[in-house]
Every structure is written in structure tokens, then in C-alpha cells.
């Protein structure tokens, strides 16, 4: 009897800790790390072997585990020290959490805690960001204007995901609760405006275009996608005309592309091109199984000459696909792409939760063309918790509907 009483309580504690992780994610790496450990300690006793096995045997839960396993085996043929191999595997570890989250939120009725906690935390971050931008002399510990914590890359990613999640919710509520829908649209516009006027990553600008087309396609079909492109073009033109910050961000990137190969490559865009070029050469050396886990720093050191600038010796090729391909070859790349496809397939229905999951996966897939976001701390955990949470909610809904059928 005592065990039966403790189990639901422990389950609620695990749900609460998952919500706490979501709240902390936009703000603090240290707090997020501590809360993730506490969440794992709380959630593991609430899961039975059968439920975890069910998720591991499914594509959505099993392919992340497979990718981690390939990373672990990849240490065996890596020609670097064991400390470098272990460091290389560290980015893969978070993938093991996805089956646990799927199992937890397939069963838990408290997934809304996590979503609302993350949204509330992001709204507070949005308010602080705008306050820093609009109030000269107001100080914060952030190093960049309008970016109170962490960095503009993660902040703009969070704001983009929140904005399109709110767009989806507003579209769903438009007929039944129009006032609430308008409020959600205003909040979404505030997130988008922050990206355009305050702080953004150039990758986020690319992802916004993809998400706009996806939103139009999902809500209104191919005509909606065309409409989204037209509306997006008009809004982009308006923001471009009124935002010196956005013009400067894009103009600098365009100038760096033009100057690449004819002048100094030591620019963010130039370095990316060099990382990609060298990474493709490394992949060609070991195309099937790669050079092994943790070998990226050693490969860039090996390729360096006396004239090589220090910034060209990196641990991160700034492409998720190339990061995996260099270490695990075609085999690892196939597992990565299969995982993304499985997660996209998980969110193929028309519910609002599925839309939110689709937004999370789309952001990670598109941004990973330009960054190794799955292995980064903030973006990686955002993906893992987002997919695990929304995937569990989709599976729970499907289970209930199946159970209710005569």
C-alpha cells in the first residue's frame, strides 16, 4: 500500500522537475544541469521495464539510442586519447533521455505543466530583453544588448519556437475564442519583433522562413504556403526597412560571403566555409564508419600548418550532419537522418501538440545545417525535452483514442 501511494507522488515530483527543467532552460545552464539530474533520479523509479522497452523498440525512442550506441562504439576505432574519445561521446548522452521522456509523458497527465512553465519563463525573458533594449542605462549581466542571459543564438531559437507554437494555438482558437487568439497573436508578434529588432542568429532568420511556409501548408494547404510566403515577404520588407539592426546583421553576412576566398577568412561566415570544406575532406578519408568518436579536434590539428590561424583549429565543424559524418561516417549520418524522420513522422497528425513538436524538430533539422545544435547544451536539451514531451503527449492521446474505440 505504501509503495502504491509513493508511486503517484513520485510521478508528480518527476513531472514537476521536468517542468522546472523547462523553466530553467532559457536562463541557466547550471540550474538546468542540476534539475536534469534530479529529474532522472525521480523519474527512473516510476518507469517499469516494459514501458521503457516499448519506447526503445519504437523508431522515435530507439533511433536516438542507436545513434548513441554508434557513438559509443565509435570510440573503439578512434585514433586519439581516451579522454578525447570520452569528451566526444558527451554530446550523444542526452539522446538516451528521449525514451524516458516518451514513457513518462505517454502516462502523465501533467505535460501541460512543462509547456506552460517553458512559455512563462520565455515570456519573462522576452520582457527583460525588451526592457534592456528600451531602457538606456539599465544594466544586466548579459554581455550583449537585449540578451540578459546565455546568448543570442539560444534566445532567438527559443523565441522563434514560442512564436510559432503560439501561432498554431491562435489558429486553433480563432473560431471558438477569438479574443484569446488575438492575445496569443500579439504575444507571438512580440517574440518575432524581438528577433527582428533586438537580437537574432542568422540561422534563426532562415528557420523563420521555413516555419512560415510549413505553418501555411499545415493550416491552409499549398495555397496557404504560397500565402505565407507573400505575407512573410511583406512583413520582412517592413522589418527590413525599419530595423537598422537586422540590416546590419544580414549585410555583414553577405559581405563576408563576398569576401570569402579573396581576403581574410577569419570571419564567422568564412570560418564556417573553411570548417565545412575541411570536414568534407575528412569524411572522404573514412566515408563508411568515420574516423571515430572524439577525433574532430585531432583532425583539425593534423590539417593545420604554420600559417593556419588558431580559429581554424576547432572542435565543432558547425554542421550537425558533418559532425556526425566525420566521426561515424555514412552509418552515423544515416542514423541521425532516420531519427529526424522518425520524429517528424511522430508529429504528422493535425493536433496543436503535434504542431509544437513539428516546430521543434523543424528548427533543429534546419539549424543543424549551419550548427551542431544537437550536441550543444541549450539547443540539444531543448530538442530532447521538446520531442520527448510532445511525443509522449501525442502517444498518450493516441492510446486514449484507441482505448475509447468500441
Predicted regions mapped to residue ranges:
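Transmembrane signal-anchor hairpin modules in multi-pass inner-membrane enzymes, especially those
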Residues: 1-86, 96, 103-116, 169-183, ...
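Hydrophobic core segments of transmembrane alpha-helices in multi-pass, intramembrane catalytic enzymes
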Residues: 32-43, 87-99, 153-169, 203-215, ...
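Transmembrane alpha-helices of multi-pass inner-membrane enzymes
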Residues: 37-44, 212, 339, 357-365, ...
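Alpha-helical transmembrane segments of multi-pass inner-membrane proteins
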Residues: 72, 100, 110-141, 149-220, ...
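Membrane-interface catalytic loops of GT-C/OST-like multi-pass glycosylation enzymes that act
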Residues: 82-87, 149-152, 199-204, 314-319, ...
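A membrane-periplasm/extracellular boundary helix in multi-pass inner-membrane enzymes
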Residues: 198-199, 219-263, 275-285, 293
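Hydrophobic transmembrane alpha-helices and their immediate junctions
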Residues: 217, 327-362
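Long extracytoplasmic/lumenal interhelical loops at the membrane interface
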Residues: 262-277, 285, 289-328
Amino acid at each position: 500500500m505504501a509503495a502504491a501511494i509513493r508511486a503517484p507522488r513520485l510521478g508528480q515530483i518527476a513531472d514537476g522537475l521536468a517542468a522546472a527543467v523547462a523553466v530553467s532552460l532559457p536562463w541557466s545552464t547550471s540550474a538546468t544541469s542540476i534539475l536534469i539530474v534530479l529529474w532522472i533520479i525521480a523519474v527512473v523509479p516510476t518507469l517499469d521495464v516494459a514501458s521503457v522497452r516499448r519506447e526503445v523498440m519504437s523508431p522515435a525512442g530507439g533511433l536516438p539510442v542507436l545513434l548513441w550506441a554508434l557513438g559509443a562504439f565509435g570510440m573503439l576505432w578512434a585514433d586519439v586519447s581516451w579522454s578525447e574519445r570520452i569528451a566526444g561521446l558527451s554530446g550523444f548522452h542526452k539522446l538516451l533521455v528521449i525514451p524516458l521522456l516518451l514513457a513518462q509523458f505517454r502516462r502523465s497527465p501533467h505535460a501541460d505543466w512543462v509547456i506552460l512553465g517553458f512559455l512563462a519563463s520565455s515570456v519573462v525573458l522576452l520582457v527583460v530583453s525588451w526592457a534592456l533594449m528600451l531602457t538606456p542605462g539599465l544594466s544586466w549581466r548579459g554581455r550583449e544588448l537585449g540578451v540578459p542571459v546565455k546568448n543570442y543564438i539560444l534566445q532567438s531559437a527559443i523565441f522563434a519556437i514560442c512564436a510559432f507554437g503560439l501561432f498554431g494555438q491562435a489558429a486553433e482558437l480563432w473560431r471558438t475564442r477569438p479574443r484569446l487568439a488575438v492575445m496569443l497573436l500579439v504575444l507571438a508578434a512580440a517574440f518575432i519583433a524581438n528577433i527582428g529588432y533586438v537580437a537574432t542568429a542568422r540561422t534563426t532568420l532562415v528557420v523563420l522562413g521555413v516555419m512560415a511556409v510549413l505553418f501555411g501548408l499545415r493550416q491552409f494547404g499549398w495555397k496557404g504556403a504560397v500565402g505565407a510566403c507573400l505575407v512573410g515577404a511583406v512583413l520582412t520588407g517592413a522589418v527590413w526597412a525599419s530595423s537598422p539592426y537586422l540590416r546590419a546583421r544580414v549585410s555583414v553576412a553577405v559581405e563576408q560571403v563576398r569576401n570569402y576566398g579573396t581576403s581574410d577568412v577569419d570571419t564567422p561566415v568564412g570560418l564556417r566555409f573553411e570548417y565545412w570544406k575541411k570536414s568534407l575532406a575528412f569524411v572522404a578519408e573514412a566515408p563508411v564508419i568515420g574516423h571515430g568518436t572524439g577525433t574532430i579536434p585531432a583532425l583539425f590539428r593534423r590539417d593545420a600548418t604554420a600559417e593556419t590561424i588558431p580559429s581554424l583549429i576547432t572542435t565543432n565543424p558547425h554542421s550537425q550532419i558533418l559532425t556526425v559524418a566525420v566521426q561515424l561516417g555514412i552509418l552515423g549520418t544515416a542514423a541521425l537522418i532516420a531519427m529526424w524522420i522518425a520524429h517528424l513522422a511522430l508529429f504528422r497528425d493535425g493536433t496543436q501538440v503535434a504542431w509544437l513538436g513539428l516546430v521543434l524538430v523543424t528548427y533543429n533539422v534546419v539549424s543543424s545545417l549551419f550548427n551542431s545544435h544537437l550536441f550543444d547544451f541549450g539547443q540539444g536539451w531543448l530538442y530532447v525535452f521538446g520531442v520527448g514531451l510532445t511525443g509522449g503527449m501525442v502517444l498518450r492521446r493516441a492510446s486514449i483514442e484507441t482505448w475509447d474505440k468500441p
